[in-house]
Amino acid sequence: HPQIVANSIPFNMEADSLNCSILGAKAVPGTPEFDLFINEVSREITVKAGQKCTAIRRAIVPQAQVEAVTEALKASLRNIPVGDPAVEGVKMGSLVGKDQVEDVWSAVRQLGSCSEIVHGGTPDFDVVGADRDRGAFFPPTLLYCDKPMAAATAHSVEAFGPVTTIMPYHNT
């Protein structure tokens, strides 16, 4: 735009997107890259309870690493206490409200048409220092989409909460 060029007007735009993180084929368990991938995806799922537009919604991994990534993410997420952030040790708080909880459940149901839940995704989970039924809590949830190239829903539906879908790729 001419005004931006002429007057150097600051401009910041956020475009709606389903962000992803892609694990390289040589990043296998025991490598720093694999560990970094697991740490970052786990962090992105749980920071702000996944309520940020830049959160990783799709974890794209080599087919040969799907099981290792899934197990490592599940192990990491099991160590994330959900509840009142004022309580020592709690790592993930609530969603913004009950309407948001229902929106995330709805998105998970839609994603379930092409994915399976491999962690979380159930209303039966522990909440520390708060009442799960009175609050707006949602469990860290992992899905697995076996055929992402044939699953338009996995690339168009965003669960705006602590939800990520693992997707394999087959060639490098």
Predicted regions and their residues:
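C-terminal lobe/hinge of AMP-binding adenylation domains
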Residues: H155-E158
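Glycine-rich nucleotide-phosphate-binding loops and adjacent flexible coil segments
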Residues: P162
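ALDH superfamily catalytic-core signature
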Residues: H1-A150, Y169-T172
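Active-site donor-binding acidic/aromatic loop of nucleotide-activated sugar
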Residues: T165-M167
